[in-house]
Amino acid sequence: MTNSRRDFLKKGALGTAAIALSGSTSGAVAGILESRTQKIPHASHFGAFYAHVRDGKIVDITSQLDSDANPTVMTRALADRVTTDSRVKYPAVRKSYLEGKGRGDLRGKEEFVRVSWDTALDLAANAIKKAQKSGGNEAIYNASYSVWSHPGAFKPNVLAGRFFNQIGGAVATAGEYSNGAAGPVNTTVVGDMEVYSIQTAHEQIIANTKVMVLWGADLYKTNRGGYSVPNHRCYDAYEEYKKAGIKVVLIDPIYTTTGQEFKADWIKIRPGSDVAMMMGMMNYLYKSGKYDKEFLEKYTHGFDQFLPYLLGKTDGIDKTTAWAEKLTEVPAKTMEDLADLMVSNRTFIAGNWAMQRAEHGEQVDWSIITLASMIGQVGLAGGGFGFSMHYEGGGDAASGKRTVGGLSQGKGGAVNLTIPASRMSDLINKPGQTVSYKGKTITYPKVEFMLSAGGSPIGHQPNVNELIEAMRKLDTIVVLEPWWTPTAKMADIVFPATTTLERDDIASGMSYSNDRIYAMKQVVKPAYEAKDDYEIFTLLAQRFGTEKKYTRDRSVKDWIEGLYSKSYAKREMNISFEEFWEKGSVHYEIPEEARKFVRHEEFRKDPVSNPLKTETGKIQIFSDKFASYNYDDFKGHPMWFEPKEWLGNKELVKKYPLHLVSPHPTYRIHTQLDNTWVQNVHKVQGREPIRISPNDAKKFGVRDGEVVEVYNDRGSILAGVVVTNTIRDGVAAIEEGAWYSPEDSSQKRPRCNSGQVNVLTSSRPTSQMTNATSANSNLVAIRKIDVLSPNLAYNPPKIKGAWDENDFTKIINNISYN
């Protein structure tokens, strides 16, 4: 039996990655080929796998089924990253920069020149020294926001931070794009970020939960990939959820994969209005007397300071369900029925991260925590709340044992300045201006030099055109990348880095279960002139006299063995490094006690002996610290703030009638894999899909499969229409992560022909509290388009002096032997 690509992909959201070598080859030949094939263990953000290598080439990828319970199709696309035409093959420098002319305005427009490694390294080192001399190390911006580049210890952002900190430091980022609004608030409200904390075990939810409210959480989609190496066991747990008969309610403008799998009741909330719905439900619970007064008194602080606002005594607006209905477009009775359902059953609220990536995103988790406190089930088995069930297999029981850590970045040296992660464009555009962050004021320095290793600023920063305009103001941009990403094309100096398949590394299995260590063995030799990030930064360190400090005279393999030596596997299980490396992984057993874990249980049992790390040791419904900041858009208790850009803005919606959301991708992690064959599964005419409802398709006169222009004041993109009943009217969804492809780089705001959604998203900060990203607060319009320009996102730029392997063949074929 053969496996067609269609058959393979029909296996759906998970699919199997264990496709056998072709059965059409005769037995004898197959045996010979098999004997010449190496099976090398490796691991990725998509799962652990074996690369089958023959004659130095990857011929197949199969999942490590003992480690990956439900493999994803994405694992099989990893081989394509090695051989793709978009590889950076050798060091390259932008033409005008190499000629000493600078011309930052030509970034992304002109050709590159192939240079030697020494030339590129010397140019980069000289640019760093020039910036240091001109403005000190505050003139250097380490933009290596690349924690998701791969799951190994040698992450490019760590290696970059280590290098800069040993030469005096650099401007870096505070907070993050994922949870920039919620994390800093939660630490004050409940004494923990919560978004990365171990969740109540699946076993406890299966045994005790009667109602699960998915407030935007899409467990099935987002658990396909992980920060570390996923085991995908959570999908087996979800099957048990179904068998347990848990009633699931989904509050989301999209009827997600998870909603469909659980046959959830779908509440089609208007994007950006979630806090209003929570306020309405809390108002109803209070007035009906159905809230848990005892829990509030014993375990929380400041409800009495929040209550006047909830009842409208401070602002004249009673936050009733009728009030909330006008904002959310959710019927008041639906909210009241849901509140009744939640207080009368053991209920678990699964929050998500997308809601807080919106204007006033700081309010979302705080409001969920307050609602959960009024329900009174926090700390009970199967009850309470969790903000990480959709991440890293949240709910998996933890081994409690040490796996492997990473390299140290060291201290920041003379410079220890950080800016909120999403303020990248402002940092460059607004030197000398200030930004607030968690009660402090930060002054932007004048940045001249920027380095990005393994990251994708043009992939993750909202308002791409604003960012590109900023990047063209810098003196020098250096990028370390295996591929000609949109960010690499905007650089002055580009170093070709290896993919993980071309170097050794070591990784841990799942942030929560923490039950495996993986050998990420080198599978094939580095392609072309690529070097691994560790070697590149070592060569740069040589030019600053810090090489010995950077490497400590250790090779990559030395570091890997050293990291492994501190693990439970080595210290307690006595498994030698050689044995581990040969086998490819080590597995820890999960203790049965871990399957009984209930988040916040110890606090509930004895809040005096087990206080939260907050101002009062309790849940802070009101925080004196927050109130002391005196911000006009963030106060001492959770509040509803109306967004500037949403469907409730009656004037703006006349021009841009669709609310655009940008969920995580189904077949990528952010921008990763967008240059591989797996993207053909869902692209529409080579563009990123835009999902709209049948009513909106009719309203705009577009059909399924057509390409449309999506636009607002920030820019425009091409996207392929997918008409679906799984999205509410008035909302459009374009998954984030497509590679940027400007149609005409000479224009100030060129149309993106690939469908990169961040061309359209707003860089408006959430509030003065965290200045985090509000990328889900956007309005757009769409229109039909007849003439389509090509999507060139994956094409390398023109490179002078480049040598194409095909050139030799062409020359030979043209030689005439007389």
Residue map of PLM features:
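Active-site phosphate/pyrophosphate-binding segments
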Residues: 281, 302-424
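Extended redox/cofactor-interaction regions of prokaryotic respiratory oxidoreductases
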Residues: 156-240, 244-246, 250-251, 275-279, ...
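Flexible glycine/proline-rich, aromatic-decorated loop/lid segments
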Residues: 257, 485-519
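Short beta-alpha connecting loops at secondary-structure transitions
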Residues: 263-268, 502, 515-526, 677
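N-terminal export/assembly segments and adjacent metallocofactor-ligating motifs
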Residues: 2-290, 331, 539-542, 698, ...
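Long, contiguous, secondary-structure-rich segments that constitute the structural scaffold
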Residues: 533-583, 671, 677-691, 695-818
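N-terminal leader/propeptide and maturation segments of large enzyme subunits in energy/redox metabolism
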Residues: 97-119, 288-331, 523-620, 660, ...
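Acidic/polar loop patches that form or flank catalytic/metal-binding clefts of enzymes
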Residues: 19, 172-173, 291-294, 335-336, ...
